[in-house]
Amino acid sequence: MASRILMNIKEEVTCPICLELLTEPLSLDCGHSFCQACITANHKKSMLHQGERSCPLCRISYPSENLRPNRHLANIVERLREVMLSPEEGQKVDHCARHGEKLLLFCQQDGNVICWLCERSQEHRGHHTLLVEEVAQTYRENLQVALETMRQKQQDAEKLEADVREEQASWKIQIRDDKTNIMAEFKQLRDILDCEESNELQILEKEEKNILKRLTQSENDMVLQTQSMGVLISDLEHRLQGSVMELLQGVDEVIKRVKNVTLQKPKTFLNEKRRVFRAPDLKGMLQVFKELTEVQRYWVHVTLVPSHLSCAVISEDERQVRYQERIHQSFGKVKYFYGVLGSPSIRSGKHYWEVDVSNKSAWILGVCVSLKCTANRNGPRIENYQPKNGYWVIGLWNAGNYSAFQDSVKYSDFQDGSHSATYGPLIVPLFMTICPNRVGVFLDYEACTVSFFNVTSNGFLIYKFSNCRFSDSVFPYFSPMTCELPMTLCSPRS
């Protein structure tokens, strides 16, 4: 009986983690107790959130600071160790609690150690028994295998637990990124609508200002007409009310003035055909926005390559170029410009970059195979800006003429009385409702296309070169022309 009670007490003070008697026991809020080393090692595995952990047995969460030493339990363990190590108790453990005989046999049916009197009792009659020494090694090996199996299963369980936590963290990151992308895209859509609204209001305000100005002028004309008539009426009234001499003096001139008076009617604008506002094609705008977003996925970092032949000043970070007039030894003071190339060179793939051309009155940009423009006393020549010469570019001339440069057309040129045929580029006019401050360039080497986008106008396509013949590497191309304001390469976040 005493041994059974002792075993029950031992079970109560055994650590559920290491299955040994508790060492420096710590108790949780749920009432369970563990060795200090065991529960501390378990902290990392049972981390929940914000410093909270869970009990390995009941999974109830608890704050880290609520771990408290259990002195009473530690005293019980200490007393139990003393009892188990005493010779008397050791003798009691080795002897049958019922008969007092030594436990030398093992009953295979019941799985317990018994004494020789137990073997002969009615309870164990007919059971197969063996000496404890004979079965101890076998069961020790079986238990060792079972222990290894459980340890492996525990490792597998811990790995599964870690996998779940990792998947949970991964999902949180994905959802967070999706939220960020959704918010960013809807913000861009709202920006597009705000921009369209602002443009429409500016057009309306401009129309209002123009009409009111004309109406004000018309009103002033009517006031002058009324005042002129009032003066003439006063003259007539004075003559009628005065003497005969006053009546007849210059009367023919007055009558002539009255006959020449023509009532000028004010010009009205009610019947003028006004532009009717139509809501923007949201579907089309979204499609344009989608196309711009798609090509922006291929944004590359482009830098400018300095050239000693170019009258260009490139910034230290090689991201900005502006025109600077220089003195050439052969020509004297001559405005000449070759343009500058961008790096890297492109032999394959899809590439996108953006250029800020704000407030510039002239510029040319795109891609080219090499620099072929020739110096000219009158400024940069455009004869070579043609696809067949390796240039796929668009540009701005005279602060308002946007053009794309296609392959040459033949035209006649008369110089010094002689006739010659010149081949200039086919200049394709480009019409834009909103002038671009920022131009996007997209090169698809395999598709043989170069596209230009008006980023200022929500990414609408400006022009597209198709069936381009890229026989070799091509480079980004930039020419600020003779306008001293800079061209600046943009970054994705600018």
From Swiss-Prot:
Residue numbers carrying N-acetylalanine: A2
Subunit structure comment from the entry: Can form homodimers and homotrimers. In addition to lower-order dimerization, also exhibits a higher-order multimerization and both low- and high-order multimerizations are essential for its restriction activity. Interacts with BTBD1 and BTBD2. Interacts with PSMC4, PSMC5, PSMD7 and HSPA8/HSC70. Interacts (via B30.2/SPRY domain) with HSPA1A/B. Interacts with PSMC2, MAP3K7/TAK1, TAB2 and TAB3. Interacts with SQSTM1. Interacts with TRIM6 and TRIM34. Interacts with ULK1 (phosphorylated form), GABARAP, GABARAPL1, GABARAPL2, MAP1LC3A, MAP1LC3C and BECN1.
Residues bound to Zn(2+): C96, H99, C118, H124
Protein family (similarity comment): Belongs to the TRIM/RBCC family.
Key word Lyase present: no
GO terms, biological process: activation of innate immune response; autophagy; defense response to virus; innate immune response; positive regulation of canonical NF-kappaB signal transduction; positive regulation of MAPK cascade; positive regulation of NF-kappaB transcription factor activity; protein K63-linked ubiquitination
ZnF (RING-type) intervals: 15-59
Pathway as given in its UniProt record: Protein modification; protein ubiquitination
Zinc finger (B box-type): 91-132
Role: Capsid-specific restriction factor that prevents infection from non-host-adapted retroviruses. Blocks viral replication early in the life cycle, after viral entry but before reverse transcription. In addition to acting as a capsid-specific restriction factor, also acts as a pattern recognition receptor that activates innate immune signaling in response to the retroviral capsid lattice.
Region listing for Required for interaction with GABARAP and for autophagy, in residue ranges: 186-199
Pfam families for this protein: SPRY, zf-B_box, zf-RING_UBOX
Leader sequence segment: none
Ranges of residues in domain B30.2/SPRY: 280-494
Catalytic activity: S-ubiquitinyl-[E2 ubiquitin-conjugating enzyme]-L-cysteine + [acceptor protein]-L-lysine = [E2 ubiquitin-conjugating enzyme]-L-cysteine + N(6)-ubiquitinyl-[acceptor protein]-L-lysine
Coiled coil regions, renumbered to chain: 132-222
Enzyme class: transferase
Protein name: Tripartite motif-containing protein 5
Post-translational modification: Degraded in a proteasome-independent fashion in the absence of viral infection but in a proteasome-dependent fashion following exposure to restriction sensitive virus. Autoubiquitinated in a RING finger- and UBE2D2-dependent manner. Monoubiquitinated by TRIM21. Deubiquitinated by Yersinia YopJ. Ubiquitination may not lead to proteasomal degradation.
Primary gene name: TRIM5
Domain of life assignment: Eukaryota
Species assigned in the record: Pithecia pithecia
EC number: 2.3.2.27
Single annotated GO MF: ubiquitin-protein transferase activity
